[in-house]
């Protein structure tokens, strides 16, 4: 199984120990960042490639915190 296939399987099984650990660590890291943060590469490279992402100049990726709840 290739690396992209392995990552894809991890995202499908969100309740696995590995995925729970990754999400917990990332959640903590994201809370330490500013509301709008420029990232060097996508969090899910296999999905980004499927959606047309290329690691060329001109592609800029930001992670933006969105408030949840309320009306």
Curated annotation (Swiss-Prot):
SMART domains: Ribosomal_L15e
InterPro entries reported in the protein's UniProt record: Rbsml_eL15_core_dom_sf, Ribosomal_eL15, Ribosomal_eL15_CS, Ribosomal_uL23/eL15/eS24_sf
GO cellular component: cytosolic large ribosomal subunit
UniProt entry keywords in alphabetical sequence: Ribonucleoprotein, Ribosomal protein
GO molecular function: RNA binding; structural constituent of ribosome
Pfam families: Ribosomal_L15e (PF00827)
A single BP term in Gene Ontology: cytoplasmic translation
Domain of life: Eukaryota
Family to which the UniProt record says this protein belongs: Belongs to the eukaryotic ribosomal protein eL15 family.
Protein name: Large ribosomal subunit protein eL15
Species this protein is from: Brugia pahangi (Filarial nematode worm)
């Amino acid at each position: 199984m290739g690396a992209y296939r392995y990552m894809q399987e991890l995202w499908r099984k969100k309740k696995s120990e590995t995925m729970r650990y990754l999400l917990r660590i990332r959640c903590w890291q994201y809370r330490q960042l500013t509301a709008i943060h420029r990232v060097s590469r996508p969090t899910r490279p296999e999905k980004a490639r499927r959606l047309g992402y290329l690691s060329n100049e001109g592609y800029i990726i930001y992670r933006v915190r969105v408030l949840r709840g309320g009306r």
